[in-house]
Amino acid sequence: LRDEENAKYRTVMKNILEFDPEILKRLVNFMNNPDEKTAVEQFGKDKKYFGICTMMVTMPGLPMFGHGQIEGFTEKYGMEYRKAYWEETPDYHLIKRHEREIFPLLHNKYLFAGVDNFLLYDFFTDNGKVNEDVFAYSNRYDNRSALVVYNNKNNHAKGWVKNSVAYSVKNEQDAKRTLIKKTLI
């Protein structure tokens, strides 16, 4: 997502949904790991960061924040670093923005965690082509639903969603799988 290889990422998601959507529950969603630059170094502290962070916490699977990510720390952390070497000050603006935009989503993680009602959509442009840079998906739990739409490219996007991409459903009698699609409405 950082490198905006959106079509590749969406293809992986589609392949998982067509093979077995339950796999999505086992994924760990993260923005960085100890072998990489920190999340704020890779994504900044504004639109890109909060867009990807929103996806991280609203996709099925386990969202995992890196060490110091919410505070905006830039010092790498990992097993080869036994102690902190920098005296970093927490970025209170970044923390407050997490509290406003991300934490409420985490408090409702039950709405996003399951895969039984998770649907990924193609985002169509006015000329009928799929815009692979826009991630559109929905999920539902009991009588609550959520629709997430995020353009992971620094450009204008205009279009619509209607039908989900194909996902497999297991037949309980013979364990065979069938591909189906649903409409947003």
Locations of regions flagged by a protein language model:
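Carbohydrate-interacting/catalytic domains
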Residues: E4-K25, M55, P60, M64-F65, ...
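Active-site clefts of carbohydrate-active enzymes
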Residues: P21-G44, Y77
